[in-house]
Amino acid sequence: MKKDIVKPSILPGFMELLPADQIVFNKMKDTIRHNYEKFGFIPLDTPTIEKSEILLAKGGGETEKQIYRFNKGNTDLSLRFDLTVPLARYVSQHFSDLNFPFRRYHISKVFRGERNQKGRFREFYQCDIDIIGNGSLSIINDAEIPSIIYQTFKELGFEDFTIRINNRKVLNGFFEGTDVEDRKGVLRAIDKIEKIGEDGVRKELQELGLEDSKIDKIINFINIKGTKSEVIKSLKELDIENDVFKEGVYELEKVVHYIKSFNVPDKNYKIDLTIARGLDYYTGTVYETVLNNYPQIGSVCSGGRYDNLAEHYTNQKLPGVGISIGLTRLFYQLREAKIIGENASSTLSQALVIPVGDTMEYSIKVANKLRENEIISELYLEDAKIGKKFAYADKLKIPYVILIGEDELKEEKVSVKNMETGNQESMSLEEAIKIIKNA
């Protein structure tokens, strides 16, 4: 009797990769982690499941619609939707055990109940860093963040990218001086300028009820461009008598000055007054990073300064600054643009050891020796024709095949074939190790 077969499938919006893509993805993740650690950030992992009251402490609304929520017994539980709220809970809970400023990185999956559409994921990796202060946090931390972004994306293989920097106090102070009431609405409209253009922003501002004279002032303001020093000079010349605005300009000038000290090339960062970052909790410096040759990808790394990370969990004032790389989205978009993944290998193996005839024990010794020398190696153990064994290596793009036949066994040598050039020669195992390690 034929048994029922369940059709193998996964839910839309969840991530699953074939080996070649998974290897590329993991290398990107390792590169990001390496750079975060290079700047002294320590690893943190928190539970995937949190109490719903923790995740919803700020209030429901859009967050409540997006989280995966369920009950286990009498406990109301949810899957985390970002890494920032768990950080706030963690720092509040373990406050007395932590050293401040607390520098942590967290690379892990988060979950959101997004609508199923292209470019939207329900399960995805975020790669976050944050520097949390106790009571206060030097503004120079805000200047160090772009150097971390720069080093990370450079090591990921990018040269032509721009870190766009602004300060929310500059925007808020300007709006106060312009007598704009719905500042959140205006910030959200400005934040969409990349997607909807200047005319779209103008239309949204009209829908918010702003008169044309105020809209013109806002549009003229966000269009202030030039070198970093020219933009700062233009902001000062606006002569806005507002303390918040003045503080924002001062902070922006200081951050830009110190970014240079952190050896970030001038071409890789600029002041952009359209950068608002839609999230309400940003209170100072804000960042967005774009790959200049691939504007359709949008921001690949963003973040900013916030005054009070954990106000819903503690009375301690915990200011911070941080960024997040949405790795899953970045990976898929880079792959779609054919920037990564072309001709990627489906294995990590550097060598495939193939026993021919009665040479299994010597072949095992050879594989052991390769691994002792940090060469990732496979041993082909299946009974198959030699052509099939070579086809296996070729399909996986294993660069070297080591053949062990009766002659190699007698002479205690190995026969090494370079799969790219087709060259094959007999040599000592020590020579083979040297060649493979130097390849």
From Swiss-Prot:
> What subcellular locations does the record give?
Cytoplasm
Which HAMAP family does this chain map to? His_tRNA_synth
The record's disulfide annotation reads none
Q: What subunit structure does UniProt give?
A: Homodimer.
Q: Which UniProt keywords apply?
A: Aminoacyl-tRNA synthetase, ATP-binding, Cytoplasm, Ligase, Nucleotide-binding, Protein biosynthesis
Task: Choose one Gene Ontology CC annotation of this protein and give it.
Answer: cytoplasm
- Species in which this protein is naturally found: Clostridium tetani (strain Massachusetts / E88)
Which InterPro entries does the record match to this protein? aa-tRNA-synth_II, aa-tRNA-synth_II/BPL/LPL, Anticodon-bd, Anticodon-bd_dom_sf, His-tRNA-ligase, HisRS-like_core, HisRS/HisZ, HisRS_anticodon
What name has this protein been given in UniProt? Answer: Histidine--tRNA ligase
Any GO BP: histidyl-tRNA aminoacylation
As one GO molecular function, the record gives: transferase activity
Give the similarity note.
Belongs to the class-II aminoacyl-tRNA synthetase family.
Q: Per the record, what are the reactions this protein catalyses?
A: tRNA(His) + L-histidine + ATP = L-histidyl-tRNA(His) + AMP + diphosphate + H(+)
Q: Which Gene3D superfamilies match?
A: Anticodon-binding domain, Bira Bifunctional Protein, Domain 2
Q: What Pfam families does this protein's entry cite?
A: HGTP_anticodon, tRNA-synt_His
The secretion signal range is: none
According to its UniProt record, the EC number is 6.1.1.21
